[in-house]
């Protein structure tokens, strides 16, 4: 480990509150350290070779939010990926109702996407749509704007574009992922942040995949939980997909409540996971990075405490730098970085309080057991 990270480590016998009290300027100092460690790497254009290829240009929602070559997710290229109606420029998207009437629409691959490649990435990148009509076509490739994070525990990706929805579901299938975490709304401040890639009822077809709506549950101000059945038409196999959408996270901001956000995290963890957790907001760096940082540290803390009954050390700057070395710009703002600490602190305190209650309850139960049989008059 780089020795310069040691100064930011929170030891097992300390706490985040003590860390804040002992280092009043720690947020600014740590975030500046993160920028210093990662900003040069994000400017090296050779690190983004596939993302910058002309044929992949329209697959990027934002021209300055791109995946590193070495950590990008690759999708398989199949001969019949684009054969669905002998038209290699179109993607089939169909809506099938219960009467088996098939209402198909076709989306031109060259009709939607980024208007151009400007800066590769900057730490002050605005999560605003750079999209345009575009007049350059794309060809089949293994490229999708998505990155493996934390050694493949997560995949962080942009909100799908209309012309990348098929690629998105293909990635879900190939990576054997059954959990999708969505941290944006489809539209925010009158701007499209994510194109809709799922049906609200019945089913829709995306290329060689059918996504069937099963059910949903809405908890106001926290989440919409959806269940889908994903069918691969090429091998006639199906899988269950769990889709969790956090509905109250403002772009570039932070959730109002750490408690509400941690409830959302607990809902995600309730489902047994297969494959990487696929996380996206709009660009796949700010809100997505914040979720991954919180989720990974809270999971580490809970596991370590359950096994050893003591808290592990925490080094948030080290984690964020590692994440940014896998996808540029992860945990995009200082406020998001601060929110990580606040949410992690609350989650840790919750675990400790539960353990204290458990011990008190155990102590009480032992003291309440009579040592002899009941007395009789």
Swiss-Prot record:
- The EC class name is hydrolase
Cross-referenced InterPro entries: Prot-tyrosine_phosphatase-like, Protein-Tyr_Phosphatase, PTP_cat, Tyr_Pase_AS, Tyr_Pase_cat, Tyr_Pase_dom
| An annotated Gene Ontology molecular function | phosphatase activity
Q: Where is the composition biased (Acidic residues)?
A: 78-91
Q: What residue stretches are annotated with the Tyrosine-protein phosphatase domain? A: 27-347
Where does this protein have coiled-coil stretches?
A: none
Q: What keyword terms does UniProt attach to this protein? A: Hydrolase, Protein phosphatase
Q: Which organism is it from?
A: Dictyostelium discoideum
Q: Protein name, please?
A: Tyrosine-protein phosphatase 2
The Polar residues compositionally biased stretches are 113-123
């Amino acid at each position: 480990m780089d020795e310069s990270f040691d100064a930011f480590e929170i030891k097992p016998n300390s706490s985040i509150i003590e860390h804040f009290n002992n280092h009043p300027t720690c947020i600014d100092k740590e975030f500046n350290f993160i920028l210093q460690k990662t900003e040069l790497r994000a400017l090296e254009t050779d690190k983004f070779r596939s993302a910058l290829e002309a044929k992949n240009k329209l697959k990027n929602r934002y021209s300055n939010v791109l995946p590193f070559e070495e950590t990008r997710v690759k999708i398989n290229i199949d001969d019949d990926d684009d054969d669905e109606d002998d038209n290699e420029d179109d993607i089939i998207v169909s809506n099938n109702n219960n009467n088996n009437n098939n209402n198909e629409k076709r989306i031109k691959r060259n009709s939607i996407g980024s208007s151009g490649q400007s800066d590769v990435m900057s730490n002050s990148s605005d999560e605003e749509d750079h999209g345009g009509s575009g007049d350059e076509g794309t060809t089949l490739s293994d490229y999708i704007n998505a990155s493996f994070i934390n050694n493949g525990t997560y995949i962080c990706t942009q909100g799908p574009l209309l012309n990348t929805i098929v690629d998105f579901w293909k990635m879900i299938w190939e990576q054997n992922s059954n959990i999708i975490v969505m941290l944006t709304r489809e539209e925010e401040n009158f701007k499209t942040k994510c194109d809709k890639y799922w049906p609200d009822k019945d089913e829709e077809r995306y290329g060689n995949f059918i996504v069937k709506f099963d059910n949903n549950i809405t908890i106001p101000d926290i989440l919409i939980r959806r269940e889908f059945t994903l069918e691969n038409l090429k091998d006639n196999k199906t899988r269950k997909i769990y889709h969790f959408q956090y509905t109250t996270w403002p772009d570039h901001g932070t959730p109002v409540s750490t408690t509400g956000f941690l409830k959302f995290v607990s809902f995600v963890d309730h489902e047994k996971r297969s494959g990487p957790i696929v996380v996206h907001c709009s660009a796949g760096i700010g809100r997505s990075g914040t979720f991954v940082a919180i989720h990974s540290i809270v999971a580490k803390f809970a596991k370590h405490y359950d096994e050893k009954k003591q808290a592990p050390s925490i080094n948030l700057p080290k984690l964020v730098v590692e994440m940014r070395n896998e996808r540029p710009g992860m945990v995009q703002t200082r406020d998001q970085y601060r929110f990580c600490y606040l949410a992690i602190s609350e989650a840790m305190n919750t675990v400790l309080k539960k353990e204290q209650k458990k011990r008190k309850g155990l102590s009480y139960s032992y003291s309440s057991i009579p040592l002899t049989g009941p007395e009789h008059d």
